[in-house]
From Swiss-Prot:
Residues 27-72 form the WAP domain. Transmembrane segments: none annotated. SUPFAM superfamilies: Elafin-like. The lineage of its organism: Eukaryota, Metazoa, Chordata, Craniata, Vertebrata. Keywords: Antibiotic, Antimicrobial, Disulfide bond, Secreted, Signal. Damages membranes of susceptible bacteria. Has no hemolytic activity. Not toxic to mice. Does not inhibit the proteinases elastase and cathepsin G. Belongs to the venom waprin family. Residues 1-24 form the signal peptide. It holds the Pfam family WAP. Expressed by the venom gland. PANTHER family: ANTILEUKOPROTEINASE, WHEY ACDIC PROTEIN WAP. It is found in: Secreted. It comes from Notechis scutatus scutatus (Mainland tiger snake). This is Notewaprin-b.
Amino acid sequence: MSSGGLLLLLGLLTLWAELTPVSSQDRPKKPGLCPPRPQKPPCVRECKNDWICPGEQKCCRYGCIYECRDPIFVK
């Protein structure tokens, strides 16, 4: 494909991506407002691997939080 054809295709794709779907144009907004964002602890990365943690502690992941914790042992 020539560079002119690629530019034309890119332009058409850009226009298509910016069009609002017809189905959402005639729908009214739902009533009410969104509630405040729930309070969550900030994402903290105390460690990156077990070797950064002191002593026997391991680097444990809980969602986006990484922290050094004492290990548990399962029998």
